Amino acid sequence: LQNYENVLSLQPSEGLLACDAIGIGKIPPNDLIQLALEFIASHKQNEYRKDLLNKEILITGGCTSEKIDAARHITNKSSGAMGLLLSQVARFRGAQVKYVHGPLKIDKNLTDGIKRYEIETSVDLIRALNNEISNCDYFFMNAAVSDFKITSDTSAKIPKNQINAHLNQNFELVPDILKTISKSKKDNQVFVGFCAFTGSIEEARMTIKEKIIQKGCDYLFANPIDLEGQGFGFLAQNEGWLFDTNNMEHYINKTSKIDLANKLITQIISLKK
């Protein structure tokens, strides 16, 4: 069945088998089966095809975490849901997918079948991307990277009355990872960045257009995070605007994150042709 381009097959999972051995042979998790059904249901009858066969896709997602001291760290609200759903949708469409992610705030059953690389800091992320970026056809930079990091590491917990001084003396900006990685982009590769914004798209549009040039990517997807029921989390819905380097923008209306991931990939494939 795997060889049929209009059949979505889920591979057996790894875990404790009936014979008391650990190995591959379990039914995929219910959450993943439900996700696959939602993906299929989002297509019209006989519309589904594995149109990404033989394509390698590299996706980042989730937050990074930068250590302050033994008890504190700098991070953000990203759950890793959008990056994961992009990964599963690309896999459902036939691609070979690698998902590089920070700490996930969603059920890890949903990662079943995805080749994953877990990272923690921005340095970890850059190292992983440098190892993998040259082989991919598409790169989705969906990770929410911490804006700041601490330059001096400490294994102790800093007293509260000293924390302000420590931060003021040791804060530095994290380099723009997408901008850095884009310098090694090949002509046949497609790089997609992501940008969260608040307020109206009219207010954010100029900044977004500047970012796509600064970051050196082919497309930048911008989505609002200050609207009720949208933004962070697996169950949240989303909408957004896909910008390209020709000042064109393509709106994807408010929908579930898996449907959004599917429509976004479809839009990028169609624009690349």
What residues fall within each predicted segment?
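Positively charged, low-complexity intrinsically disordered leader regions
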Residues: 26, 41-56, 205
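Glycine-rich phosphate-binding loop
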Residues: 117-194, 198-229
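Internal gly/pro-rich beta-alpha loop/helix module
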Residues: 1-44
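A structural motif corresponding to the C-terminal end of an alpha-helix
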Residues: 6-7, 89-97, 176-189
